Structures are given as C-alpha cells and as structure tokens.
C-alpha cells in the first residue's frame, strides 16, 4: 500500500520527459532546472516503489511500470484540467439565449415568475419562454430546456428532478352535497368527471395509485377542456370531480372551497427539467436548471418530501 499519493506535478514531469526525450529538455519546457526534474522523478519512483525510467547514453526509456504510469498520468492530467476549467468557469457569468418550454398552467403560475427572478440574478441571459399544450420534441421545437410534469422521460433526453408532485381528486362541497362521494375508483364512472387533456395526460384515462396498487380508470362527464385553469374553475362551481396537481388546488383545499375525493389515491406527476446536453457543457443551462430546482423546492417542497405513487 502506498504511503502517499503521487502528486500531479510529478506526473506532469514524467509526461514532459517522455514527450521531450530528456531530463534537460523537460526542465526547459517546465521552466525548472535539471536537478528539480531529477528530484521529482526520484520522489515519484519512491512513492510508487518502482523504477519508471531507464537512463542511458542514448536517452531515457520507460520501463513497463513507467509505461503504465505514463498512460495513467495522461488521463489524470486531462481530468485535472477539466476540473480546473469547470471550477474557473463557475466564476464567470452565464450569458446568451436559452429557450425554455413548459405547459400553460404551471408555466404561467410558477415558471414565469421564476424566470423574472432568474433575470434579476443573471441579467446577461436572454430567455425565450414558450408555452405548449402538447408534448414537444426539443430539437424540432428548438427548445433548450423543457419543464415537464410527467415521469415518462424518453431515454434520449437528460432529466433532472426539480421537485415531486402528485395529482389528486377534488370536488366542491356543493357537488358532493348533490351526489354521494365515491367510495372506490369504480364508482367514479357514475360521476360527472371534469376531464383535462394536457400535455402528458391521456384523455379520459386517470392513472391512480395508493402506494400498493396502480389502476387505470376510464372517466367521463359533460365537461372537458385542454385548459387546467378552466377545469379548476368548473370544479369550484360544483360541476364535477377533477384530477389536478396538488400545487394548483392546495389554496382551495385550505379554504374549504374544494375537498379531497378518495384521498388515499393520487397520480404521480413529478416536475422535471428535461434537456439534451450534459450540464457541464453549458453554463447557462446549468444555472437555469439549478435556479429552477431551488425555486420549485422553496415553494413546492424538496424532492424527498413528495408523494411516491406506484
């Protein structure tokens, strides 16, 4: 077992010797004396407890151990440079255009105010914010970062969990005074259900779980819309039972204008940042994702505080 780890500067000395062909040439490249180069190689060999270089009148040659050390040294020094570049990059300010997409309801209520705050912190950024009522293709729709309320993310995208979320069943007290509250998922078929067709939702099918099982429930009613805001208004007016995100209905639950229906059931609808390229390649993308994660967690709860549905 090694008493200590090789130092990066000693690995650099070894690489320079191999590239230049001699101790003196390596010393000149490094701006050091030949004695310094000799000393660092001795320290490296002592650290690794092996001979790395054979010196002769014709020059220097790597031993078998030296060849392995040289190959690893190249990899280590490359990674070291990436580390330095990444840390140095953090000190600079992100700038340029970034295109962000989202659904209408969540985009208006949460992401738009978040972008306003983002621009206060990073005024060099330019943000184009576009709302969609459909699932989008990042390439075809020219979007750098899409905010999705949907756990089914294609494998060819990268996804970062912003916060956990669930959709819950709700109705106004006025509706439940007219019609008996359902006691099972099957009884939903006897009720006026307010059907929403948003980006990720199949029209008329509610996927509901209780932590032990998950069921697909076919529902119908006299009213349906592709706008969650309209469906929420209908529910408040006592028109039926709806399935909406908890962040959307929580104020009305607290005020008593809405009540939970079948509270043991919910639909997982976690909130994700979806993008194509790794975050380390783009500072503006990384800054936006990290900012939106902090924003959502501050207002909607941290990822480990959410509801997990089967």
Curated annotation (Swiss-Prot):
Gene3D superfamilies: 3.40.190.290, Winged helix-like DNA-binding domain superfamily/Winged helix DNA-binding domain
Residues in HTH lysR-type domain copies: 6-63
Stored CDD domains: PBP2_CrgA_like_9 (cd08479)
DNA-binding segment(s): 23-42
InterPro entries per the UniProt record, alphabetical: LysR_subst-bd, Tscrpt_reg_HTH_LysR, WH-like_DNA-bd_sf, WH_DNA-bd_sf
GO biological process, one term: DNA-templated transcription
One Pfam family recorded for the sequence: LysR_substrate
GO-annotated molecular function: DNA-binding transcription factor activity; sequence-specific DNA binding
Signal peptide positions (record): none
Keywords: Activator, DNA-binding, Transcription, Transcription regulation
Sequence similarity: Belongs to the LysR transcriptional regulatory family.
NCBIfam families the UniProt entry points to: PRK09801.1
Protein name from the UniProt record: HTH-type transcriptional activator TtdR
Organism: Escherichia coli O6:K15:H31 (strain 536 / UPEC)
Taxonomic path: Bacteria, Pseudomonadati, Pseudomonadota, Gammaproteobacteria, Enterobacterales
Gene (UniProt): ttdR
